[in-house]
Amino acid sequence: INKDCLLPMDVGRCRARHPRYYYNSSSRRCEKFIYGGCRGNANNFITKKECEKVCGVR
């Protein structure tokens, strides 16, 4: 699995409300979260499909 996918979900420090997806290593699924728009980490994908492709979800 891509190491970025193992990072914890991080909403970032800003207050925008961007719908994004992250890989939840506990459920082994890509799940929706609201991204604040800045900072955060690499476990942050614009689409569920992109998250699933990068993180190897089947």
Curated annotation (Swiss-Prot):
GO terms for molecular function: potassium channel regulator activity; serine-type endopeptidase inhibitor activity; toxin activity. Keywords: Disulfide bond, Ion channel impairing toxin, Nematocyst, Potassium channel impairing toxin, Protease inhibitor, Secreted, Serine protease inhibitor, Toxin, Voltage-gated potassium channel impairing toxin. The record marks 15-16 as: Reactive bond for trypsin. It comes from the Eukaryota. The keyword Coiled coil does not apply. Gene3D superfamilies: Pancreatic trypsin inhibitor Kunitz domain. SUPFAM superfamilies: BPTI-like. The keyword Secreted applies. It is found in: Secreted; Nematocyst. Residues 5-55 form the BPTI/Kunitz inhibitor domain. One of its GO terms (cellular component) is extracellular space. Disulfide bonds join 5-55, 14-38, 30-51. Dual-function toxin that inhibits both the serine protease trypsin (Kd<30 nM) and voltage-gated potassium channels Kv1.2/KCNA2 (IC(50)=1100 nM). PANTHER family: BPTI_KUNITZ INHIBITOR DOMAIN-CONTAINING PROTEIN (PTHR10083:SF374), KUNITZ-TYPE PROTEASE INHIBITOR-RELATED (PTHR10083). Belongs to the venom Kunitz-type family. Sea anemone type 2 potassium channel toxin subfamily. This is KappaPI-actitoxin-Avd3c. It comes from Anemonia sulcata.
